[in-house]
């Protein structure tokens, strides 16, 4: 009996040693509103139950492919083109493990771009995508590994990403965690663990990562409050106000664009498509822009049944002094505008006012490295971010450096330690911590003679932080000039 016990213990120790030398791989396809991205992660799995350590995967390779799946609504069979490019990329990167392709899972998770489609179009795209991956991919794949995830899932995964990169997962029941505001093109997510003495009365998303670690997360997604959709809704509102004056040659003023700049607004979605040709001209008035943007957030017309509410009657726990990361387009746009990562909303307001007062020619001169669309939309974009955070979500306009203020501090960034902040890492963190030991055992058995560390990193430039020099230093130093009158808008 003792000899058998010794043999079993020796086997367990040998197995544990094997795990320390082996890497497990997974593939995540992020099917977003603007494009699809494939990200390959690796981690060293824990084989015993109950799990005591939260597994944090490492990004190995990544590639972005355009357009997004929603672009194939009229021709779903064409999804094979971006999917083939994605699968071929993963096959090449993971070539050292070609003998165990069938044990490496691939997950596709689609977000707001597909959530916003009519059901028949969404179903057709997903059906063609699942069929193609099933027939073409050599990796482990079942139909239920391709999903259109809810906005709340997206928000919860983003929260996991932020707190993993900040190194605070698994510490003191959530008190030390960060919240996240993730602003996409079509939607916006807010996720955080409220202060311990508060309840999550709605939109509760429990996350269990180990037997010792469970978080009661508040996660809420706002469809049509992404930065692209908000731009379309703003134009629709302004046109509606002027509808009696409009014909195909009328020009309507839009305060969220530079003075004198003429353009035709984009109404690419069915929800906000307007069957007339309209020209707009910018007036570059930050205060009026904020007033127009506030109308996107219904504060008075909807009953708040569960206090407290943000807008559209949506419950949100008190923000208190929770630290937040402003990610996605929040971090990206404010970095372009020259707002420091750790700054105050008062400074955001000052920079927005200054940018909106410039001409389009001045913007092109200050930001020569940015795309034409980014240049044209910068006044709108930073004004929308400011209005969303203050009027929409209720963050306080104060100097966050003042320790006497009980503030919700926001760090504006799209990257933490050079890793892009998005939901994909969080999704694979959750998946890694739910993985059955039997799957790991099968993988370890078949990779016993393989070097699982032979996979070489290959990361697309779009996944790396950009060193933006144009405009940044000037705006940091001159964001709030001495004696300047800053519009006092809330």
Regions found by a protein language model. Give the residues of each.
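A positional/structural detector of protein chain ends, strongest at the extreme C-terminus
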Residues: 1, 486-490
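Beta-propeller domains
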Residues: 53-55
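Cleavable N-terminal signal peptides of Sec/SRP-targeted secreted and luminal proteins
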Residues: 2-18
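Helical "lid/coupling" subdomains associated with nucleotide-phosphate turnover
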Residues: 26, 40, 62-99, 107, ...
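Short loop/turn segments immediately following beta-strands, especially the blade-tip
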Residues: 43-48
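Cleaved targeting-peptide boundary
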Residues: 19-24
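A short acidic Gly-Thr/Ser loop motif
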Residues: 29-37, 181-187
């Amino acid at each position: 009996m003792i000899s058998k016990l010794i043999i079993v213990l020796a086997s367990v120790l040998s197995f544990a040693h094997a795990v320390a030398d082996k890497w497990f791989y997974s593939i995540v396809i992020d099917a977003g509103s603007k494009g699809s991205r494939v990200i390959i992660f690796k981690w060293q799995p824990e084989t015993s139950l109950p799990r005591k350590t939260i597994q944090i995967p490492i990004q190995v390779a990544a590639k972005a492919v355009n357009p997004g799946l929603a672009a194939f609504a009229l021709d779903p069979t064409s999804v094979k083109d971006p999917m083939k490019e994605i699968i071929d990329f993963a096959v090449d990167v993971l070539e050292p493990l070609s003998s165990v392709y069938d044990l490496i899972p691939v997950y596709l998770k689609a977000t707001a771009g597909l959530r916003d489609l009519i059901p028949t179009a969404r179903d057709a795209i997903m059906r063609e995508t699942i069929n193609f991956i099933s027939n073409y991919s050599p990796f482990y794949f079942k139909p239920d590994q391709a999903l259109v995830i809810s906005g709340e899932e997206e928000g919860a995964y983003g929260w996991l990403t932020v707190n993993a990169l900040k190194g605070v997962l698994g510490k003191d029941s959530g008190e030390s965690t960060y919240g996240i505001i993730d602003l996409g093109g079509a939607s916006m997510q807010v996720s955080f663990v409220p202060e311990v003495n508060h309840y999550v009365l709605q939109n509760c998303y429990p996350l269990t990562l180990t037997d010792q670690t469970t978080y009661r997360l508040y996660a809420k997604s706002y469809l049509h409050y992404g930065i692209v959709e908000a731009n379309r809704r703003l134009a629709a509102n302004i046109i509606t106000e002027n509808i009696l004056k409009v014909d195909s040659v009328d020009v309507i003023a839009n305060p969220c664009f530079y003075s004198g700049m003429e353009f035709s607004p984009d109404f690419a979605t069915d929800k906000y498509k307007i069957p007339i040709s309209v020209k707009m001209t910018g007036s570059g008035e930050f205060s009026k822009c904020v007033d127009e943007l506030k109308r996107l957030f219904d504060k008075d017309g909807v009953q708040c049944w569960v206090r407290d509410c943000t807008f559209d009657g949506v419950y949100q726990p008190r923000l208190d002094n929770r630290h937040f990361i402003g990610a996605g387009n929040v971090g990206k746009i404010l970095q372009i505008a020259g707002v420091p990562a750790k700054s105050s909303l008062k400074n955001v307001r000052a920079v927005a006012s200054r940018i909106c007062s410039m001409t389009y020619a001045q913007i092109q001169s200050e930001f020569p490295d940015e795309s034409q669309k980014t240049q044209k939309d910068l006044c709108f974009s930073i004004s929308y971010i400011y209005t969303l955070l203050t009027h929409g979500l209720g963050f306080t306009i104060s100097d966050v450096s003042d320790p006497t203020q009980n503030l919700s501090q926001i760090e504006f960034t799209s990257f933490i330690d050079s890793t892009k902040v998005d939901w994909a890492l969080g999704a694979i963190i959750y998946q890694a911590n739910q993985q059955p030991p039997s799957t790991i055992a099968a993988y370890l058995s078949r990779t016993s003679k393989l070097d699982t560390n032979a996979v070489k990193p290959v990361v697309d430039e779009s996944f790396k932080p950009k060193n933006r020099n144009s405009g940044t230093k000037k705006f940091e130093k001159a964001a709030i000039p001495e004696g300047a009158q800053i519009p006092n808008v809330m």
